Amino acid sequence: MSQCFAVKGIGGADQATLGSAEILVKYAQLADKRARVYVLVSTWLVVWGIWHVYFVEAVFPNAILWLHYYAASYEFGFVRRGLGGELIRMLTGDHFFAGAYTVLWTSITVWLIALAVVVWLILSTGNRSERRIMLALLVPVLPFAFSYAIYNPHPELFGMTALVAFSIFLTRAHTSRTRVILSTLYGLTMAVLALIHEAIPLEFALGAVLAIIVLSKNATGATRRICTALAIGPGTVSVLLLAVVGRRDIADQLCAHIPHGMVENPWAVATTPQRVLDYIFGRVESHADYHDWVCEHVTPWFNLDWITSAKLVAVVGFRALFGAFLLGLLFFVATTSMIRYVSAVPVRTFFAELRGNLALPVLASALLVPLFITAVDWTRWWVMITLDVAIVYILYAIDRPEIEQPPSRRNVQVFVCVVLVLAVIPTGSANNIGR
């Protein structure tokens, strides 16, 4: 059988590689050659991470897609997605672009910090083992991780960070009072983030419920129900408030408020593979006035209510969206399968923790349905579902005895193949491929 990486027989390492390998040898009592494999994989991740950042910033910049999330404000009334723009307007005045880019990169930074904390917890929890190294190296290449932050920096990165923080703190909470306080803080955070993007509380309700059930060890059923209500209730109320009293007749006023400024817009010329290459290699240029682009492509949507949005999704139809749905489902299955393969903790063991508490996850899952009904970003919703399950699965797995088991040579080979490939392919860029 072909092998992506020869685990045995790696030689010629330089001094830096040897030094890093020695650290891994001491960490998990690895053989020198096996340790060098992980050092080389780590180096591969760093190199490709730098390339992805360079590609997004210098080769194919698409910030115009993400700045528009902060275009609306409360200057003309209470409107959905208005909080981000309102904060920028209050803090930066006429310097919209400086403020918007700051918020954009803040969302990316806090999410990458959250991922770094998860990696650190994987390596520092329990006894040192080789599988911990493998799991720590797997995390950055998952669909919701590094490439998602770089290629798809939606405002939900703030919600993703909040979910990770909430899940981690729950693993440290040992009393009902602490869990109730954490759930209250998380719920209030979701209520605020709903004012930046109305999907955020719905996207992460499932993750919060799974964390409460699985990671709150020895919690009573009553405590879990109270924590669930506190964690998902405030955000849900915010979403309903936006649906009921948020202004819908505001597109023209918002358009008049949007600042002018030229921004790179590669999508205007990226109509064929050849045109994409022409843009990448600098043979053609493409800029758009931010004001004109937002007024044409974004502000008209602020006049739509939820029913009209659902009708538009119905017009697109399930057949057209099936590819996006299938790709997202593939991400979910592949992610959970790789976590199981690397950690050696069976998926059934993880889901067995839900036995007797299925009503709460089902309720949280029901909150995801409006997302699929009112928006066509079906791959994106599946990536968020993947995060909901994966982050709790990972934090659960690192406390299990199975992760201390030494991997077989084949385990390492498969792991290396997968990570090397996923480092190159930015799965997080698949916002809605397949539609």
From Swiss-Prot:
It is found in: Cell membrane. Keywords: Cell membrane, Membrane, Transmembrane, Transmembrane helix. Signal peptide: none annotated. It is a multi-pass membrane protein. The chain crosses the membrane at residues 40-60, 103-123, 133-153, 195-215, 226-246, 313-333, 358-378, 381-401, 414-434. GO terms for cellular component: plasma membrane. This is Uncharacterized protein Mb1527.
